[in-house]
C-alpha cells in the first residue's frame, strides 16, 4: 500500500529552516602563469628547466630514455644558451624576469579593481619556479580565504598549460586536512571581452608605427602534433581565436596569418611554424609586417626574445625591412579588463 504524504505544510514560513549565515571568510583569487628562473644564470635556468621538463603534462613520455636525454644532455647544454637569452630581457632593476614583473602588476591592479569587495584577496603564482602555487594557496589561506579561484593565465586550454596548473593546485590540497574550496576559470579564447581587448591592442599599436604592415602574423605557442592528435583542444581554440580576431579587425586569412612558435625537440609540432613562415614572407618580397601573440597573457622570453629578437632578425636577414611585435595585453587597461570580467564572472555565487 502506498502512503499519501502531504507537503502542504512541510516548509511553511513558520517552520522553514533558517538560511545559513553568510560566510565571513575571505575569497582568494590566484593568478597563475607558466614560470621563470629565479636568476638569469645557467644555474637558475637549470633548476627551472628540470622542473618544467620533468612535468608529465609537458613531456608525456617520462621514461628512462627521456631521463637520460634530460639529465645527460639538455640540462648540461641548454641552460647556458637560455641564460644568455634571459639576460637579454632581464629586468635588472628588480633582478627578475619581465614575466614575474608583469604578473605581479596584474595581481596588484586586479586587487585595486576589486577593492570595493574587501573580502576578495588577489595573489599570484607560477606553475614552475617561484612563487609556487603551494605558496600562493598557503598565503591566501593564511589571510582567511576558505574559497580560492585559480586563474590559469592561458586564453586557450592545453593539457601542457592549464591542466598542469589544475594538477598542481589540487595536489597541494592533498597535503591539507582543512581544505579550501577550489574553482578554476575556464579558457576564454572566444570571449567577447578578450577578442575586443586583443583588437584594441593591435589597433593602438599600429597607430604608433611609422609604416603600415602588409599583413599581421598571429603567433601562438606550439605543441607536439601528437598531443592534438590524442585529443588536446588547443589548436582548435587557437584557430577560433584567430577567426574571431579576423572578423573583428575586418581581415581575411591572407592578412592575418596563424602560426605556431617555440618548437622543441625533433618531433613534428603544430604548423605552420612561425619562424619558417616569417622567413618565407621575407623571401617572397613582403617588406613590412607586425606580429601579435594572442596566447600569451604577459610578455616573456618567448615574446620578447624569440619573436622581437630572433624572428625579427630572421625577417630582416631574408629581405624584410620593417618588423614590429605587438605587446601582450600585460597589465594594460584592456588586459586588466579581461581579467576583471573573467574573475567576476567565475566568482558568481561567492560574492
From Swiss-Prot:
Q: Which Gene3D superfamilies does the UniProt entry name for this protein?
A: 3.40.50.1400
Q: What is its main location?
A: cytoplasm
Which positions bind Fe cation? 221, 302
Pfam family of the protein (one): Ferrochelatase
State whether keyword Iron applies: yes
Identify one Gene Ontology CC term for this UniProt entry.
Answer: cytoplasm
Which keywords does this Swiss-Prot/TrEMBL entry list?
Cytoplasm, Heme biosynthesis, Iron, Lyase, Metal-binding, Porphyrin biosynthesis
Q: Name one GO molecular function term.
A: metal ion binding
Q: Which reaction does it catalyse?
A: heme b + 2 H(+) = protoporphyrin IX + Fe(2+)
Query: Which Gene Ontology BP annotations are present?
Result: heme biosynthetic process
Q: In which pathway does it act?
A: Porphyrin-containing compound metabolism; protoheme biosynthesis; protoheme from protoporphyrin-IX: step 1/1
Q: Does the keyword Coiled coil apply?
A: no
CDD domains from the UniProt entry:
Ferrochelatase_C, Ferrochelatase_N
Q: What is its EC number?
A: 4.98.1.1
Name the PANTHER family for this protein: FERROCHELATASE, FERROCHELATASE, MITOCHONDRIAL
Instruction: Please report which protein family the annotation says this sequence is part of.
Output: Belongs to the ferrochelatase family.
What does this protein do, in the record's words? Catalyzes the ferrous insertion into protoporphyrin IX.
Protein name, as recorded: Ferrochelatase
> What organism is this sequence from?
Bradyrhizobium sp. (strain BTAi1 / ATCC BAA-1182)
